[in-house]
Each structure stands twice: as C-alpha cells, then as structure tokens.
Amino acid sequence: MPPLKRVKRANPYDLYRTCKRWKCPLMSFLKVEGKTVADKYCSMGSMGVYWRLALHGSGRPTQGGYVPLRGGGSSTSLSSRGSGSSTSISRPFAGGIPLETLETVGAFRPGIIEEVAPTLEGVLPDAPAVVTPEAVPVDQGLSGLDVAREVTQESLITFLQPEGPDDIAVLELRPTEHDQTHLISTSTHPNPLFHAPIQQSSIIAETSGSENIFVGGGGVGSTTGEEIELTLFGQPKTSTPEGPINRGRGIFNWFNRTYYTQVPVEDPDEIAAAGSYVFENALYDSKAYKHEQQPWLSRPQDAPEFDFQDAVRLLQGPSGRVGWSRIIRPTSIGTRSGVRVGPLYHLRQSFSTIDEPETIELIPSTVDEEEVLTGVPESAEGPDAEYSDIDLQSIGSDEPLLGTGIIYPLVGGGQIFLCMHRAPVGWSSGTYINHEGQSRDDGEYVIDNGGQSNITPTVVIDGSIALSLEYFRHYYLHPSLLRRKRKRNPIFI
C-alpha cells in the first residue's frame, strides 16, 4: 500500500490560465472573473450607496426663494450656481411694493442712493467737494440768497509782547495737529487670598503696628481673634510603651525559648564583623615598614575572636524604644534542599534595664577649727633663757632645736605669726609673717625691711603662734646671700 501523501491544491488563477483552452468547471471561471453571486450583491450595494450620496449632496435643483437685500439696494441678484446659469430676478415681496417706499419704512435699512453727477475736469482729487466762488453773479431770480465766506487761520506761534516792567514775555505754542487723546483703562481685580492689615487704635507711645508685635508672649495693643486654649501634653514621661506589644507566635516570637536561645549582650553590633579578617594596610601605617620592631608581621595572624563569629546570617529585629535584637544562625549542617540543622540565637540588648548602683567609698573631708596657741617654745622662753650654739656648717643634730611637738620653720625677723594648718587633699598650707620693727630691752633694735635691709638677720623666735586659715607666702632673700657674678672679659685670639 503506497504511503498517504497530501497533495497541494493548485491555485485557481493557475487553473484559469491552464483551462482557458480546455473545459473546466464553471466555478473556477466565475471566481476568477468576479461573476459569482456574492460579487453581484456587492456591486449592486455599492451602486446604491453611491447614487444615494450623490443625490443627497446635490440639493434640490429649483430656482426662486427669498434672497436678502444687498448693500447696494438693488433687487437684481445673480445666482452663483454655475457659470452657465441664467440671471434671475428675486422679488422680496409678493404684493409688489414699490422700491421708493422702502426708505420710509423703519423696519428696513434704507438703500444707498447713488447720485449721478457730471464729472468735472481739471479738479484735483484732493480738492474739496464744495467749491465756493470768489464772486457770486447777481441774478434777479436769486433774491435773498447771500453767499458769505469766513476765512479763519489760527497762528501756530503767538508771541505776547510785554506791556509793563512786571510783565514777562510768553511764547505760546500750539500743536499743528489736533490734540492726541490717549485712552487709559484701569481694571481692578480683588484678590480673595490677600487681606490688608487693619490699623487698629494703638496705645500711647506705640509707634509700630499692633498686629505683629509680641512682647513676653502677649500682643501689644488691642488684639482680635479667637482664643484657643492649648492642651499640655505631659504624659508619658517614659520611653517604655504602656500597652502590651502584640508579639508573634511560634518561630515568629523571638522570645520563645523553644526555637531560640536567649543570649543577653551589651552591644549586638559587635557581631556584625563576623567572618571578616583584620589586617594592617602598609600605605596608612608607618610602623608597618619597621620589621625589626614588629617581627610578627612576617607570619599570618588570626582574626580576633568575637562571640558568635561563625554567624552566617544576621536578621535585624524591630528596633523599638525598649531594646535591640538580632537573630543569628551559626554555620551548621545543611542539606541539598536548603534545610539547615543548628540552633538559633536571639541576641538582645535592653535599653530600659536599670543597673544596680555602684558603691563608691567616699573620703571624709574635715577642717580643723581655728586654734590659737599662746606661749612660746621652751628654747625661747624668757629673756634669761640660754640659747644653744649651733654650727652653721652642721647638717644634723641629735637634739631637736625646738623640742618635740610642732615643727616650726626658722624665719629671720621680729615678731612672727606662724600660720599652719593640716589641710586635706586638695588644700595648700601657707605662712603669714608679720614683719615689724621690735625694740628689745638690751637696746638692740631690729629693723625688718625684707630683702632691702643691709643687716644680716638673726634667728629670733618670739611672740604668739596662731593657727588660722590664712594662705599667704612671703619669701625674701637677703642681698648678702646672693652670689656675686664675675665679669668675664672677652678673649680675642
């Protein structure tokens, strides 16, 4: 059995050319020549549409009808239907009203009557239409007719001569043409969005507007308007929300201990550097070039160890006014389907946590009361007391100079007021020395003039000793104790 094969059908136009000499089905000829029933219906329909549109657009081919009057007042009009059309006369009124009576009818515009006048030769076209002769011939038939001509010529420049000594010459100029009138129009459009300030009566000595001046929160002068009482928002005074927070359930609740391991941290951002390495850039670190100071640069260094540095996924939680949370999943075993096996950690930093107060031991600060000691040390007690001879070259001595007790500095001068105070940390102690001239019983007069005295001071301790809070220091160096400077002569070689 031969295989079934689809044979392509021939084109009707090819069959028409082939069957022109042979007998072929009639349908092929009609289709190619366009003589089928469908072609006939289409031709007849298109013909009807064409004639319908042609007759409708041409209008009614009749004459007559009312034609309005033209500007010339003529009743004869030429129709504009074509160059070969005939002239038609239109009658505006069927009753045959004569044309002369149209001027007396107020409902119609009077026609323009063109007067036929003889053409005057020799008259310029710019000459006036009415010509007045210089002399009018006297005619007996024209009695009572007087023709007069008034010639008035205005001077353009008028010079007024001064008549008296007080007069001033005035030169009056008139324009050559008529006065030029300028038309000026003004239109005013009110703006509903703008309101001019209303000047109100101000108080005495007020020179500025009272609408925009505020002193101390109040308006100066009389103010108008509606007073609106403001509400003070004093609550809440804390950043913690008052109402409960709608938390998720199951794995969406980060505080669920079934799915997450709660880890309180101080700063969750420290774990953001997980998986990064720390190295030094030699371009910005000058010490990196000195290998003798940093021998460890030759070998690789490990990254610093952070908590949860093996986190491969960070989820930033809702940052509210209470705390800050992060969810991390450390590296663990995973399958091809994407399932990860491992714990989830919830890192939480609470902002509203109040820590326990730290106990700080305070150092007591005490100030001694003023204490006045009346009396003198034993070594200077009385005029008959024996003085100890002390070698000035000696550095130390077995016996105390002033006995036991308070140590007083040796100050040369007369009566001494020694002020000492045991001050706490942060205070400074000082001495106040009152230098006064003193006359002793043996006739010796001690002059205390500070560093300007030429007398070598002696070690004299006398008078009362007062302890007070006086902070003054007066130090004088006697000129005899100064080192003399040797003048050096320059040596020229």
From Swiss-Prot:
This is Minor capsid protein L2. It comes from the Viruses. GO terms for biological process: microtubule-dependent intracellular transport of viral material towards nucleus; symbiont entry into host cell; viral penetration into host nucleus. Disulfide bonds join C19-C24. Pfam families: Late_protein_L2. It comes from Odocoileus virginianus papillomavirus 1 (DPV). Minor protein of the capsid that localizes along the inner surface of the virion, within the central cavities beneath the L1 pentamers. Plays a role in capsid stabilization through interaction with the major capsid protein L1. Once the virion enters the host cell, L2 escorts the genomic DNA into the nucleus by promoting escape from the endosomal compartments and traffic through the host Golgi network. Belongs to the papillomaviridae L2 protein family. Residues 64-89 are annotated as: Disordered. GO terms for cellular component: host cell; host cell endosome; host cell Golgi apparatus; host cell nucleus; viral capsid. Keywords: Capsid protein, Cytoplasmic inwards viral transport, Disulfide bond, DNA-binding, Host endosome, Host Golgi apparatus, Host nucleus, Host-virus interaction, Late protein, Microtubular inwards viral transport, Phosphoprotein, Viral penetration into host nucleus, Virion, Virus entry into host cell. Residues 75-88 have a biased composition (Low complexity). Its main location: virion. It is found in: Virion; Host nucleus; Host early endosome; Host Golgi apparatus. GO terms for molecular function: DNA binding; structural molecule activity. Interacts with major capsid protein L1. Interacts with E2; this interaction inhibits E2 transcriptional activity but not the DNA replication function E2. Interacts with host GADD45GIP1. Interacts with host HSPA8; this interaction is required for L2 nuclear translocation. Interacts with host importins KPNB2 and KPNB3. Forms a complex with importin alpha2-beta1 heterodimers via interaction with the importin alpha2 adapter. Interacts with host DYNLT1; this interaction is essential for virus intracellular transport during entry. A motif (Nuclear localization signal) lies at residues 1-10, 483-489. Highly phosphorylated.
